[in-house]
UniProtKB/Swiss-Prot annotation:
This is Ubiquinone biosynthesis O-methyltransferase. Belongs to the methyltransferase superfamily. UbiG/COQ3 family. It comes from Histophilus somni (strain 2336) (Haemophilus somnus). GO terms for biological process: methylation. One of its GO terms (molecular function) is 2-polyprenyl-6-hydroxyphenol methylase activity. The keyword S-adenosyl-L-methionine applies. It holds the Pfam family Methyltransf_23. The gene is ubiG. O-methyltransferase that catalyzes the 2 O-methylation steps in the ubiquinone biosynthetic pathway.
């Protein structure tokens, strides 16, 4: 059984055409992208010539940004239309990105069968809260990571503040996101993420919150993880 939620996939299929519109449904992701890219570069000590896997890449906003920094990027997702958009946009930008429609669990099986090289950097951003079994995603990512590689997750804390900001505020009041984009019950507390990553034999190297400034339209990072947050992991042996 594939680790996916058909209703979640349908949401993003419907929004595919607006993926690269900086003022469309994915405006918050476009605004967030410079901040998360900078975080990834800092934690990974740069991306030039590093082999990167972007899990849940969607229309390729982060994949392209990392490729432009010199990374060798593979993007995987289970949606159809967003991947088509991603391939077309990368071609228009003159970027070579390997986009595949496949789950990370299936990708791992394929890589294992081919004895393929593992990845220096793996990103799984804004995805764990959209799948039935986050632990399975985490374990597969860990298995695909090089011994000295760096793994990134971002998600949303299950708090009243997060609901007020991400669901009520962003979806219903400010209408920054389509209604129904997020399901509060699927939000993930940092303690839960750390428990799952510990089970997967990963250690957290850094965790921080990211926050939106309505006046500037930009995101910034701090230590407040009560709403949106992202974290860096490595193998426990590192």
């Amino acid at each position: 059984m594939q680790n996916l939620d058909p209703q979640e996939l349908e949401k993003f299929e419907k929004m595919a055409k607006s993926w690269w519109d900086p003022n469309g449904d994915f405006k918050p992701i476009h605004q967030l992208n410079p901040t998360r890219l900078q975080y990834i570069q800092q934690q990974a000590n740069g991306l030039t010539e590093k082999k990167v896997l972007d899990v849940g890449c969607g229309g390729g906003i982060l994949s392209e940004a990392m490729a432009k920094q010199g990374a060798i990027v593979t993007g995987i997702d289970m949606t159809v239309a967003p991947l088509e958009v991603a391939r077309l946009h990368a071609k228009e930008q003159g970027l070579v990105i390997d986009y595949q429609q496949i789950t990370v669990e299936e990708f791992l099986q394929k890589q294992t069968a081919l004895y393929a090289e593992k990845f220096d950097v793996i990103t799984c951003m804004e995805m764990l809260e959209h799948v039935p079994d986050p632990l399975s995603i985490i374990q597969s990512c860990r298995a695909l990571l090089k011994p000295n590689g760096v793994l990134f997750f971002s998600t949303i804390n299950r708090t009243f503040k997060a609901w007020a900001l991400v669901v009520l505020g962003a979806e219903y009041i400010l209408k920054m996101l389509p209604k129904g984009t997020h399901d509060y019950d699927k939000f993930i507390k940092p303690a839960e993420l750390l428990h799952w990553t510990d089970q997967a034999n990963l250690v957290c190297k850094n965790i921080c919150g990211y926050h939106y400034n309505l006046l500037t339209g930009k995101f910034w990072l701090n230590q407040d993880v009560s709403a949106n947050y992202m974290a860096t992991f490595q193998h426990k042996s590192i």
